[in-house]
């Protein structure tokens, strides 16, 4: 209730005159409009005190509570909507309102002026609302002009500095394919869809006292059991921005570099407790968290291993540059910089945990994120995994779209995993009942065409795939020269790595009876084409000999991270003989170092006897333990030292021969008989 209505209720405008129940009149206009009108016009019901004001008859004082709402009701055709008037009347006073209306009808001439006066009042209200709208529109236009001016200023600043906010690339194909959705980075989103929100959030009870409000992050959710976060000296810098792409790099402060040196010493000791001691002083050192996570995983402590990886991701996300975006697909991190590799490995380990946890949709989003950081080089070779995650997440449309957009410039059909996963995606898509019949038949035909091309290009995949699925092939297939055992043996070693990697990871996707029957039909079609002398068969054989001579380093790195036994066993000797560190597997040969680890002087007497013996075989061995030259060229890292050591051992063993043992004399025959 307004103050003006209270004054009228108390009768202050008419002095101390008593008020009757049917003699109250109230103006629906403001005081300013009342002053502009000049002389007042009389309504049909006069005030007992003198000249009356135009208004609305009120028979109950409690109607004043809702009388102010009448001013905001719309006016249509000069009349106010009837719902507002009815709402202003209390339910218990409907009879009074009706009696008041009947009394007003019997007043004669006074009642004839009521409609015209009401239309006049509604016209005044309409004019007032138009004025208010004009004022609002003028202020809105002014604010929009101000925002446009601000945008122009920001654009000029960005053009002058050359630092543009990372946005979509000019070629939108990669942007759309590698676009990451924030909500799919949270595994709870997928688990809620499977089990319901109550099952996932049932144990999470909010605490009202001593609540901690951590920084909002997308990759992980901080836990109350973690140490208090303080900046560990890790930051991110924007290197350059060109062609719609922004290149970033992590940086280590001097304090973080000291912690990194201590970490390398702890790794060389081969004692996990030394890493635990380091984490007590530096609880958010990323490499220590990742290395200790591997140690916990080897000891079957999966929960602790996953928690350590999440803490490493949280530490790196808190160090993000303000312009670094996880979802745009236009931010790049160079894997040649050692500071950036920790982020790659942390994302990969988190993706592996999510897949084992039963969240393939979330793992697919992490896979796209890793691929978007450096899609051209693909240092972790995520193209060997993304098809598997898309099939497990039943996101067949995404896999087909990725194949269609990247086949022209990446030759995805030359990878066995894409050659077999894409037709499988088409076939599974054709099995969906919600698709129209024409689309189902089209997808089925496309699937059959692609699987026949895959079997022609990679015939050595069929028999190992059937064996992994516990399916016995027909005699006509297993005994044929094209799909027989010779097909698997004759393929190059690099191709064997890719085939073993795909079968060890995705063979269970082919176990469905409908899938096996469809595969069997197309196998017989391929055999008919081979027997008919199709020239495509010979062309594929020549292509296999040329393309798969040696696998690149990123594929070897991916095989090591996958930990698939069949694929690891197929690695070449030059990779298996190298020392592989969990925090940096197979570093690039063209590494860009921002700082060099200082060489340490260790007393010779404190070393292991066998290690000292092998070290003494090196040509640059000295008893005093002299310091090598400073700088990147002179200071050799641990991996290079181990490589030299292994080469020296191999050379020694190659030149080491045992003399032929002399034949035993006849006199010693009785002595040897005692061992029988």
From Swiss-Prot:
Phylogenetic placement of the source organism: Eukaryota, Metazoa, Chordata, Craniata, Vertebrata
Start-end of Basic residues biased regions: 123-136
Taxonomy, superkingdom: Eukaryota
Gene3D superfamilies assigned to the protein according to its UniProt record, in alphabetical order: Tetratricopeptide repeat domain
GO biological process terms held by the UniProt record: regulation of protein K48-linked ubiquitination; rescue of stalled ribosome
Pfam families xrefs: Tcf25 (PF04910)
Source species of the chain: Homo sapiens
Role, per record: Component of the ribosome quality control complex (RQC), a ribosome-associated complex that mediates ubiquitination and extraction of incompletely synthesized nascent chains for proteasomal degradation. In the RQC complex, required to promote formation of 'Lys-48'-linked polyubiquitin chains during ubiquitination of incompletely synthesized proteins by LTN1. May negatively regulate the calcineurin-NFAT signaling cascade by suppressing the activity of transcription factor NFATC4. May play a role in cell death control.
Keywords: Cytoplasm, Nucleus, Phosphoprotein, Repressor, Transcription, Transcription regulation
Tissue: In the embryo, widely expressed with highest levels in brain. In the adult, highest expression is found in the heart. Repressed in cardiac tissue of patients with heart failure (at protein level). mRNA levels in the heart are unchanged in patients with heart failure.
Name of the protein in its database record: Ribosome quality control complex subunit TCF25
Record family assignment: Belongs to the TCF25 family.
């Amino acid at each position: 209730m307004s103050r003006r209505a209270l004054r009228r209720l108390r009768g202050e405008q008419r002095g101390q005159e008593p008020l009757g129940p049917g003699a109250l009149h109230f103006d629906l206009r403001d005081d300013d409009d009342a002053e502009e009108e000049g002389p007042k016009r009389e309504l049909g019901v006069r005030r007992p005190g003198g000249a009356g004001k135009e208004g609305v008859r009120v028979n109950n004082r409690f109607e004043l509570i809702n009388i102010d709402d009448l001013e905001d009701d719309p006016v249509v055709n000069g009349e106010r909507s009837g719902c507002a008037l009815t709402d202003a009347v209390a339910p218990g006073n409907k009879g009074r309102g009706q009696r008041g209306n009947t009394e007003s009808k019997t007043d004669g001439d006074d009642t004839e002026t009521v409609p015209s006066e009401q239309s006049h009042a509604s016209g005044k209200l309409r004019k007032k609302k138009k004025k208010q709208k004009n004022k609002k529109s003028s202020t809105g236009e002014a604010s929009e002009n101000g925002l446009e001016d601000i945008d122009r200023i920001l654009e000029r600043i960005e053009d002058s500095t050359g630092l543009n906010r990372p946005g979509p690339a000019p070629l939108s194909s990669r942007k759309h394919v590698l676009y990451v959705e924030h909500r799919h980075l949270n595994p709870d989103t997928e688990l809620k869809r499977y089990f319901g929100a109550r099952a996932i959030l049932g144990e999470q009870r909010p605490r009202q006292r001593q609540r901690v409000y951590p920084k909002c992050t997308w990759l992980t959710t901080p836990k109350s059991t973690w140490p208090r976060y303080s900046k560990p000296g890790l930051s991110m810098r924007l290197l350059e921005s060109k062609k719609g792409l922004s290149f970033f790099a992590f940086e280590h402060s001097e304090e973080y570099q000291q912690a990194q040196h201590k970490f390398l010493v702890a790794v060389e000791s081969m004692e996990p407790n030394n890493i635990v001691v380091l984490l007590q002083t530096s609880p958010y050192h990323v490499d220590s968290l990742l290395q200790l996570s591997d140690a916990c995983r080897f000891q079957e402590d999966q929960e602790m291993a996953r928690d350590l990886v999440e803490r490493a991701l949280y530490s790196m996300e808190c160090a993000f540059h303000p312009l670094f975006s996880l979802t745009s697909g236009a931010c790049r991190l160079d894997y040649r910089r050692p500071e950036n590799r920790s982020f790659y490995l942390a994302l990969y380990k988190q993706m592996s945990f999510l897949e084992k946890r039963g969240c393939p949709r979330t793992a697919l989003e992490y896979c796209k994120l890793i691929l978007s950081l450096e899609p051209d080089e693909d240092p972790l070779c995520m193209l060997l995994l993304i098809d598997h995650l898309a099939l497990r997440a039943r996101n067949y449309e995404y896999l087909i779209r990725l194949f269609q957009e990247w086949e022209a410039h990446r030759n995805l059909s030359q990878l066995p995993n894409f050659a077999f996963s894409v037709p499988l995606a088409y076939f599974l898509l054709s099995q969906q009942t919600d698709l129209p019949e024409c689309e189902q038949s089209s997808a089925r035909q496309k699937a059959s065409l692609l699987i026949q091309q895959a079997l022609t290009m990679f015939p050595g995949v069929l028999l190992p795939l059937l064996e992994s699925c516990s399916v016995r092939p027909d005699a006509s297939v297993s005994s044929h020269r094209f799909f027989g055992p010779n097909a698997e043996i004759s393929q190059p070693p690099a191709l064997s790595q890719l085939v073993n990697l795909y079968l060890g990871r995705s063979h269970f996707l082919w176990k469905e009876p409908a899938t096996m029957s469809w595969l069997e039909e197309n196998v017989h079609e391929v055999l008919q084409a081979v027997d008919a002398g199709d020239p495509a068969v010979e062309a594929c054989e020549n292509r296999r000999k040329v393309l798969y001579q040696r696998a690149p380093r990123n594929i070897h790195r991916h095989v090591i991270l996958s930990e698939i036994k069949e694929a690891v066993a197929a690695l070449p000797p030059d990779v298996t003989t190298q020392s592989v560190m969990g925090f940096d597997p197979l570093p690039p040969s063209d590494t860009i170092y921002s700082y060099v680890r200082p060489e340490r002087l260790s007393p010779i007497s404190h070393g292991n006897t066998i290690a000292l013996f092998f070290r003494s075989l090196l040509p640059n061995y000295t008893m005093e333990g002299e310091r090598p030259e400073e700088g990147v060229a002179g200071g050799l890292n641990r991996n290079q030292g181990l490589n030299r050591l292994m080469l020296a051992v191999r050379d020694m063993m190659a030149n080491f021969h045992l003399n032929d043992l002399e034949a035993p004399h006849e006199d010693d025959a009785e002595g040897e008989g005692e061992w029988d």
